[in-house]
Amino acid sequence: MTNKNTSTDMRKNAPKGDNPGQPEPLSGSKKVKNRNHTRQKHNSSHDM
């Protein structure tokens, strides 16, 4: 229950900037998203 709330709170707090540790995890998430995007692009090329 607390874990679920923390995830939502983190996301809500991220834009708020209340916690200094929030931007750190956000950056990590962005890196993962970017990595996924690159993989998709590569996959598209392979599919072609």
Curated annotation (Swiss-Prot):
It holds the Pfam family SspP. Transmembrane segments: none annotated. Keywords: Sporulation. InterPro entries: SASP_SspP (IPR012614). Residues 1-48 are annotated as: Disordered. Induction: Expressed only in the forespore compartment of sporulating cells. This is Small, acid-soluble spore protein P. It comes from Geobacillus sp. (strain WCH70). The lineage of its organism: Bacteria, Bacillati, Bacillota, Bacilli, Bacillales.
